[in-house]
Amino acid sequence: MQMTAPKSPTPSLVEYVEAEIIPRYDSFDRAHGTDHVRTVIRRSLELAAHYDVDTDMVYAIAAYHDTGLVAGRERHHLVSAEILAADSRLARWFSAEQLAVMCDAVEEHRASSKRPPRTIYGRIVAEADRQIDAVTIVRRTIQYGLDHYPALDREGHRARCLEHLREKYGEGGYLRLWIAESENARRLEELRALIRDTPRLDRLF
């Protein structure tokens, strides 16, 4: 696919999302706050430029993708889809058929999913959500641990962080990449090199 310049979503949709959806991320842990959702939106629009897709749909899927964290992490992808489906105001910009595709994409974005997303919209947001910057991922993992496991000491946080990194990003880990045009494959190899380099990894704690 030949990349074109990323298109901008409809201003009225952006205004609604900025006022009603983005602020929801303020209550989530630091690894999934407003900086995270804005990054996923930006990366989704960049990836969408490689494909013949609806920019507004891509934008909204990215904006809603983690809203379900309000109900906890385990079912957040399902709850996020429920939140999107229940938002009657989205009918101003999207048809029922579009909303169904969007709900599926939100539901299927989770990194631990064993199957690829069924549509290009799902693959775009899933790939955009995989922000594979080695140092950033380690720091986000540490932040998540500090927020959710405050009783752990330094060594406990280090052990939890290493376990998570290996389980998700290591060789044989559950992370899957879905978009060929993404730079995530190269970045994943860089992260795996960092995971193997224990002295360097320890310096990030």
Give the ranges of each region predicted by the language model.
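An amphipathic alpha-helix signature
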Residues: 10, 14-18, 41, 57, ...
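Small/polar-rich, solvent-exposed N-terminal microdomains that initiate assembly or binding
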Residues: 18-27
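An active-site-proximal "capping" alpha-helix that borders the catalytic cofactor pocket
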Residues: 40-44, 75-90
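His-Asp-centered metal-binding catalytic motifs of divalent-metal-dependent phosphohydrolases/nucleases
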Residues: 55-72, 76, 80, 101-110
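Hydrophobic, well-structured mid-protein blocks that either form specific transmembrane helices
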Residues: 82-115
